[in-house]
């Protein structure tokens, strides 16, 4: 039986070896590149695979159609996932006739999700285990094939329990894999009523609350002991980490967080005292408790505290889905420039946000909104403001993939809106200037202009009507269920990181990127229907400032409002945009590295976009709502925007590529 394996960590190594020992043919292994910021104390699946002579890959997005096609060419009979960190798309799961199976580090249906090893210790469980289950679209929700229980001893910490689970996993796989190889794969459904879900743990989750019971604090120490980041507290501004501890039942009447004694080092909790056996001050070395007390300058009666607060208010948590996109990455930068915002983000890639990945107030998970529904629901509940920015928003895709546009832009986003309703969270939703369609007004008014689209046989309008329908649903939820919302409608925002030249090469980019690609490659600039269509181009900096003010929502003035964000003064036809771009290109210092200008070429829209396309003559916003609600006025001239956008793309072109 031929297998394709997705694996990482020690469990991944155990799984690969067990599959080989059971006599399977492994066609390929998919793993992850190690993160330099992570403590990689565990075994390397890639080194194991290379040593065994098995092809091994570590794609950024294994769910990309290119990788799906490559896996299909391998023709696997069965798929295994052993601690692979990303969910697999349904397209991949359906490639193996015998099914796809995941090894999870808990006794399902309990502790679905991330970091079950740590969570069972945090919660003081006495038993856990490993489960092999069928993979379905929802994480850890498929039918159970086999499981093995593991007792948790009182002196177990994260690393010792990790070793126990690896041993149990190997035993489980050794017993079940030969049976599965013969085609006998019995499974039983999980009981949904018993399901629990836990999210990813972060280093900052190790902060100790001394007002908790001593058993809770001790369990936290066990759960994140080395090589995990550790449980920590503060003496003044000095951070220290506790690596091992024991419970003392008597707090001697001391207040929580008070140092009872320094030799041994004991700290009062809500109902007892924690004895600190070993610990570490700052980035120093690990020492025993009494030496730690001496290093920190602790005396009996001292009070430990939480980290020094930058302000009395909790930071506002903003959830951005599609955080790696054009708007998402620029908005993240604006929010992180303010001390009182924390950003949680998801996207299928991280190239545009790589500059934020180590920022302490930026929390990113690579994932797909159509797959990671439980993560999304958890973070909608956790955050204060939600921005669902994921959408297919390039015209050629409207005619090429109308059903996919509807599924993503409407159906997936509707689910997120319903989470916002359920947990009573404020949503800032990206409508679009496209909802106005072929409106005949000189400028489009959010509250008065008619929304006019073409006939059903023009799939070009699928994006417009998907967004419009969601606008109406959100409005109805506001009226009937009290949903707090603001709809914003961007008008042709431009700037650095708009999209990519590779996207332009397959026709799936914004207009200016396509024009820049023509200049870079020395191909004619294509003017669709002569390029007479007029748009109002808005600098990303102006747009993001307006969006930031919507999030701030001073005096709640944005609640229940629809706000156009565009620059009426920057109106130009596509032909005028192309001419301005060409002028800037000819003056650019890198101009000599690129081919000669190949001229303009007039192209009929039907031949470029397909028969389902229909264009709009003009699109100009009224920005009265933005002025009134935000005190906002765009200020950046179109030429400045064009020059900055062009400069970004030209400098992104590889030197060798320029020369060719």
Curated annotation (Swiss-Prot):
Pathway: Nucleotide-sugar biosynthesis; UDP-4-deoxy-4-formamido-beta-L-arabinose biosynthesis; UDP-4-deoxy-4-formamido-beta-L-arabinose from UDP-alpha-D-glucuronate: step 1/3; Nucleotide-sugar biosynthesis; UDP-4-deoxy-4-formamido-beta-L-arabinose biosynthesis; UDP-4-deoxy-4-formamido-beta-L-arabinose from UDP-alpha-D-glucuronate: step 3/3; Bacterial outer membrane biogenesis; lipopolysaccharide biosynthesis. It comes from Salmonella heidelberg (strain SL476). GO terms for cellular component: membrane. The record marks 102 as: Transition state stabilizer. This is Bifunctional polymyxin resistance protein ArnA. Its EC number is 2.1.2.13, 1.1.1.305. In the N-terminal section; belongs to the Fmt family. UDP-L-Ara4N formyltransferase subfamily. In the C-terminal section; belongs to the NAD(P)-dependent epimerase/dehydratase family. UDP-glucuronic acid decarboxylase subfamily. The keyword Methyltransferase does not apply. Residues 1-304 are annotated as: Formyltransferase ArnAFT. It catalyses: UDP-alpha-D-glucuronate + NAD(+) = UDP-beta-L-threo-pentopyranos-4-ulose + CO2 + NADH; UDP-4-amino-4-deoxy-beta-L-arabinose + (6R)-10-formyltetrahydrofolate = UDP-4-deoxy-4-formamido-beta-L-arabinose + (6S)-5,6,7,8-tetrahydrofolate + H(+). The record marks 140 as: Raises pKa of active site His. The active site is at residues 104, 434, 619. It comes from the Bacteria.
